[in-house]
C-alpha cells in the first residue's frame, strides 16, 4: 500500500477507519466522522487561542492533582456508540480533536489518546465552523456518551452547557454570558468566571 502523504491521494467519498487514519502522513489536520473525512478549520485565530489558553489555565490548576485528567488539542479522541465495548482500530470510524476534554476513566487512555467518550468536552467556535459541523458534533457526542458538552461562542462571549439526561439525550442546562460564573455539572467545585475566559477578547 503506497504511503499517503497528500490529502489529494484520498477519496473524500470513501469510508475510512482509525487504522487508515494512523497511516496518513500529510500536513492537513482532519477528523474522521463515521468513516468520512472532515477537514478541520485552518489554524485557529488569536482570539480562539486566548480563550483556549484561559480555560486551560483554570482547568489545569483544578485537575492537576485529581484522578480525572485534562487534555487540550491536538489530542485524538476515538468515539463510537456507548453501548459498545472497546473496539479495535479497524472497527473505529470516528476520530475527533476537541479543543479541551476531561477524562476520568484511565482505562480508555492509551499512547494514541482516548479510546472512548471523555466525560467533559469543550469546543470553542471559530468562524470556520459550519452549522452542519456543529450539529454533527452535538449528535456524535450525545450518541457516544459524552456526559457534559460545552459550546463556547467567542463573538457573543457566551457558553452553552449541555448535560446528558437519564435517556442519554442532551439537555441545555445553562446559557451563560459575559461576567457570569459557570459551574460544570460534573465538577461543581470548579467555578469558571467568563469574565476571565473572555479577558482581552477583541472583536475582529
Please state what every model-predicted region is.
Residues 1-204:
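Gly/Pro/Ser/Thr-rich low-complexity, intrinsically disordered segments predominantly at protein N-termini
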Amino acid at each position: 500500500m503506497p504511503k499517503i502523504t497528500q490529502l489529494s491521494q484520498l477519496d473524500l467519498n470513501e469510508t475510512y477507519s482509525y487504522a487508515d487514519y494512523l497511516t496518513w502522513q500529510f500536513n492537513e489536520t482532519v477528523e474522521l466522522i463515521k468513516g468520512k473525512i472532515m477537514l478541520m478549520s485552518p489554524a485557529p485565530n488569536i482570539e480562539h487561542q486566548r480563550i483556549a489558553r484561559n480555560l486551560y489555565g483554570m482547568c489545569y490548576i483544578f485537575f492537576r492533582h485529581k484522578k480525572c485528567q485534562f487534555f487540550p488539542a491536538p489530542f485524538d479522541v476515538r468515539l463510537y456508540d456507548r453501548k459498545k465495548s472497546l473496539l479495535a482500530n479497524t472497527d473505529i470510524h470516528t476520530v475527533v480533536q476537541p479543543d479541551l476534554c476531561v477524562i476520568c476513566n484511565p482505562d480508555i487512555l492509551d499512547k494514541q489518546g482516548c479510546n472512548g467518550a471523555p466525560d467533559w468536552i469543550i469546543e470553542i467556535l471559530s468562524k470556520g465552523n459550519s452549522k452542519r459541523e456543529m450539529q454533527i458534533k452535538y449528535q456524535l457526542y450525545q450518541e457516544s456518551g459524552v456526559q457534559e458538552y460545552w459550546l463556547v461562542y467567542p463573538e457573543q462571549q457566551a457558553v452553552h452547557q449541555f448535560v446528558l439526561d437519564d435517556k442519554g439525550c442532551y439537555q441545555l442546562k445553562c446559557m451563560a454570558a459575559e461576567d457570569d460564573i459557570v459551574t460544570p455539572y460534573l465538577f461543581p467545585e470548579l467555578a469558571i468566571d467568563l469574565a476571565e475566559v473572555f479577558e482581552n477578547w477583541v472583536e475582529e
